């Protein structure tokens, strides 16, 4: 049995094998920016309403330049260019009587008995379709947001109708839907108790259809995630709607207990239901397992909790790429993954064998009997047959479709494994959006992944060896919400190069790129491997594909600056920093690379020595994330220390520090000279000029960074010790502020 067959019928893969991943360290981003840094330097914008939560529904309208937001008791229209300005909001609360009924049913009137807007769709050129929970009375409405001439306008709901089967009752439940023409396809819970799970079609001219109720073979406690309309051919009669969800696996062995799996389901858009059986039910519904796992010798490690799916369109509308984020359901370890699927692989699974179980005590197997014609799951059209309607399907086709909705073979990810993994990072992936970017050496897919701690990860998919295998590289980690609220929805505008992120507490907007934060040197810009950015000869700026590509330096595939930046002379001269220490004391040599993925190496050149030797960790030497700590200083520690960042095999000097180790007597002379000096007016102190005379008679004007730590002699008074400790602390703090700088500033 191959891996595909083993993954399909689960008993052998119900266990989560973590032998190969349990000790895996989380991937570090090259650049990490806090909310404060984004706010101060990179233009993060936020929107929130007073006493309102749960911004779950986002809709981008590129034509009108608006972002529509659905939240608790409100629908808002924001500018795509700046969500903080020109916001228009309309209240849509649940009626008082509905809230009272909700409260009488045992729900909390303050947190549950509200109208939580879950669904927003563009209905036509002037109206939106919005649906909300309505205090456990699902309701939908058409909202006018533009005039016939295109002018932006906003009024209240013009047409109200029952939202049952369109949006959930309970605000804790997710809604997944797509509007195709005037038809709404939804995956929801259709009852107050949250037990009637259904895939439902409403609105439009075709009859309303749903899945078979209370049949675990069709749906078994599903959690709906996303819905897409994807054409199958040039004939619109072949169009299908694809549902992505997770559910309890009916095919799991009883001994394994309850097990969650991810699914992709399909229905035909022109399905009209059956004539004698499956009346007002789907006759073309099929589902297959969606696998995202890491192969291993002892078994596969499964990421079985589907969280979100993004459809990245291509030139051929029939073959988009599907990017999906998953998490684990195991308590053994915490992990998330991104898997990529092709529509050809999805269709291949639905054309494969059906899953079959003869009886309650039998195992699930591949169906070996005769499959009726037309094949269940095929749409009635002239492309694949002569049937013009599902009502014309023979009874044996309808009966087979009712009893065999599950496919035997799963859908495996491209490359056979996840594109990107994050294990033990302290967060879970919740949302994903993608953008296809033209770079100097090809086109690249850039992923934006939302987490449950309010961060967005920027990941690029690059070829790994021979195509089509790819790997994901983590470029950035951005804290877009100050309160670390979980990200619940994301929308992307490739046209405006903006990302819109929603959480329970607010909506945020960030640009897709921050080229100036990548560095001030050609090598830094090239090592970043950001397809949005390139070195223009003087700065890291936005890359625009033009005919003059030779003037822009960019290498996304390899990230190798050795050739591209060989002629770059900017910032090639390191400023020399002087650091002072006292025998038997300590000295801290600060050097923190901009990239968290860089490895720092230290070399030392003693006085009178021609060669640099590598500084190794020992009892007196401690490496830290921010630099090198030297303890028990000796006179022979004086010399030149060079800090070099190594990344992707490329070495880049960061800092050159000259350490002078002084005797206790020299340090004492300095202290007494300072105490005898008259108080200086406010401003920079120049006492170090006298101090440098002890080290460099006749010089010392070039010292722009000083730090001294010395032991306290035992014969000094306590008061003198206190004064010196305070003086040293002031000296350390002032130098730290001068030298550290922000993470987005260069160190030389």
UniProtKB/Swiss-Prot annotation:
One GO term of the biological process aspect: cell differentiation
Residues in Ig-like C2-type domain copies: 561-659
Pfam families assigned to the protein according to its UniProt record, in alphabetical order: ig, Sema
Ranges of biased composition (kind: Basic and acidic residues): 732-742
GO molecular function, one term: semaphorin receptor binding
Glycosylation sites: 82, 124
Signal peptide boundaries: 1-25
Keywords (A to Z) from UniProt: Developmental protein, Differentiation, Disulfide bond, Glycoprotein, Immunoglobulin domain, Neurogenesis, Secreted, Signal
Region annotation Disordered: where it falls in the sequence: 708-748
Location within or outside the cell: Secreted
Top-level taxonomic group: Eukaryota
GO cellular component terms given for this protein: extracellular region
InterPro entries: Ig-like_dom, Ig-like_dom_sf, Ig-like_fold, Ig_sub, Immunoglobulin_dom, PSI, Semap_dom, Semap_dom_sf
Its biological purpose: Inhibits axonal extension by providing local signals to specify territories inaccessible for growing axons.
Family designation: Belongs to the semaphorin family.
Identification of the protein by name: Semaphorin-3B
Gene that this polypeptide is encoded by: Sema3b
